Regions:
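Short coil/turn connectors at secondary-structure junctions
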Residues: 52-54, 102-106, 144-148, 167-168
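Conserved catalytic cores of soluble enzyme domains
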Residues: 115-240, 244-248
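Face-selective signature of the C-terminal outer-membrane beta-barrel domain
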Residues: 38-39, 101
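A generic local secondary-structure boundary/capping motif
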Residues: 34-35, 45-47, 94-99, 138-139, ...
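Amphipathic alpha-helical segments at domain termini/boundaries
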Residues: 1-35, 190, 195-297
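Hydrophobic, Leu/Ile/Phe/Ala-enriched alpha-helical segments that form helix-helix packing faces
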Residues: 22, 88-97, 138, 242-249
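A structural preference for short, pocket-lining loop segments at secondary-structure junctions
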Residues: 53-61, 65-72, 80-118
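Conserved CoA-thioester-binding segment of acyl-CoA-metabolizing enzymes
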Residues: 1-22, 26-38, 44-56, 60-83
């Protein structure tokens, strides 16, 4: 496998590669203007067209640093960044509230983030509330009919990927030759938490998709719908996926999209073989006690 030029830290470049030339208007989504350059500088939000279709763009800026929060740099999604991204999603929902399902604008997420910014101040104020707000916003947009496509161009790691990517209808990723990484946490952190030596985990990472960091392993789990082989391939892949997602929503096939759809895809690819059994067991066990939790009438 020949290594290609990395896109890590190049979220802004990726935007220009994907959208119609010169169409990206940063800081404006619908009627919402993001006028404060010091609020969430690591989050890039705006409006562009993609083959003439208006879409919302949300990305992390690998070259920005939030001076109010020292741990927020190099694409990390911090407290302010999470809220800023959520605001962009809600502005999109509001702008298209009266439009039919076929005209809801797509949301394109450019993913390159090494994680969240869990500094002391962020934890005190509620970093989890910020990332949860962004996740909820994307889930609401998805269920209201907006096609949401995540394009992994570099790092998709930990809780930052949980909020900036995993709520999408479909996830695409540049293939492994671009150095893309998708995983929960570095093996060094896993080693400390589960008390296994690093050497053992490195062996496991070559055998198990759960421990591995590359996009191909995540693809086998169904977490990535498709791998993109070239930089020029990002734009047509996103355009095609938007059309597929929109068609599925118009046909009422929501369960084929988003987290639930990726679960089924992983099962079909043989990467999540225990999933059906666990779901069946949980459904059976809950049915046995469901009456206790039924709402009072």
């Amino acid at each position: 496998m020949d290594m290609q030029e990395s896109m890590m830290g190049r979220g802004r470049d990726a935007i220009e590669m994907i959208v119609d030339a010169g169409s990206f208007a940063e800081g404006v989504v619908g009627a919402k203007s993001f006028d404060d350059p010091d609020f969430g500088p690591g989050a890039v939000v705006g409006t562009a067209t993609l083959q003439g279709t208006v879409c919302t763009i949300i990305a992390s800026d690998g070259g920005a640093m939030n001076e109010k929060f020292p741990v927020v740099y190099a694409g990390i999604i911090g407290l302010e960044e999470g809220y800023k991204m959520a605001e962009a999603v809600y502005a999109s929902i509001l702008e298209d509230a009266e439009k039919p399902l076929a005209e809801k604008r797509p949301l394109v997420l450019i993913v390159d983030t090494p994680g969240n910014g869990p500094g002391k101040v962020e934890e005190i104020f509620g970093m989890n509330k910020s990332t949860a707000a962004y996740q909820l916003a994307l889930a609401e947009a998805r269920l209201k009919g907006h096609p949401i496509i995540a394009m992994v161009i570099g790092r998709a790691i930990s809780g930052a990927f949980l909020c900036h990517g995993l709520q999408a209808d479909a996830i695409l990723s540049l293939d492994a030759q671009f150095g893309t990484m998708i995983h929960v946490m570095p093996l060094t952190s896993v080693s400390r938490i589960i008390r296994k030596d690093l050497e053992t985990l490195e062996v496991l990472s070559k055998q198990s998709a759960v421990f591995a960091a590359g996009p191909r392993f995540f693809h086998s789990l169904g977490g990535v719908e498709a791998l993109v082989e070239t930089l020029d391939g990002m734009r047509p892949a996103i355009v095609a996926r938007i059309a597929e997602v929109r068609a599925a929503k118009l046909e009422g096939r929501q369960d084929d999209l988003g987290p639930w759809g990726r679960g089924k895809l992983g099962e079909a690819r043989g990467g999540r073989i225990e999933r059906p059994r666990v779901i069946e067991m949980m459904t059976r066990d809950f049915a046995a006690v469901a009456d206790r939790y039924a709402p009072s009438r």
